[in-house]
Amino acid sequence: MRVSIETLVENARVLRSRIPESVRMLCVVKADAYGHGAAKLAPALSGVADAFAVAIVEEARELREAGIRQMIVILGGACEESVREAVRLGASQAVYEPEMLMELEDEAKKLNVTAKAHLKVDTGMARIGVRGEDALKALLDAWKKCPHVEMEGIFTHFCVAENDPEFTEAQNARFERAIQIVRAAGYSPIAHAAASSAMLNPRYQHDMVRAGIALYGGGMPEVPELQYAQTLISMPIRMETIEPGDTVGYGRTFTAARRTRVMTLPIGYGDGYPRLLGNRAEVLIRGRRAPVIGNVCMDMLMVDVTDVPDAAVGDTVV
């Protein structure tokens, strides 16, 4: 797998140029930066990103070890030990239950530091987050007893921003009501709701937007400048010619209609290549496209290179 850090940084600059200067941009680098390598990517993005987001505390630790000193928001829930480590790392933990607050308070008090948290509001995802005004007010009551915990942010997540504007608007209205309640209680957190699918809509930008899949080149066709940054590369390990009527792979799902030159690549679904791409995908070899034939195996796949007569073992295949 080849990853272009330069392409990812340029994607971040493109996204940054599309939002107002007053709106912060948080770059989501969870799941090892969507498989692109968070420890290498985050430092390269530090000049563009105002903040970073991860899913779990282990990912926050990796960023700190890579030299990231900016805001790191842990978007997911956490057990007690993870919450305490977030305090030690200076990372901002998503909070939606009083018990989490107390764990942050206890650890921060012990270390004589101020813990940071982002209040998560469930506006319709039904995943994690405080749900309803009564629960929110109860959490705020608990927060008053936690002087060592700063409410750095408040956030929610839209679940159908791509194709259901009515429900997204309803979610945003619930979020704005939650912000109103929180600010009336004396807090001034950074508000953020929009991920990639909504980050260019001024109504949903609030104080900060979260660039996730768009950062990696996907999910935003309205910004054609965004480019994918991963290239999957392999090399053939075998060439063989089969006759008309011969079949290829498990299930015999491909039958040769002509004398066919078959190239075998040492990559399969065990390496993350989707099994469903058998008889559907194409590869690029010597500048020409060639179809994947037969079912994708666990660690191999086959390609019809009959129309690429100069293809050979040792070639680079994309």
Which residue stretches match the model-derived regions?
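Mobile, glycine- and charge-enriched loop segments
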Residues: 13-16, 21-23
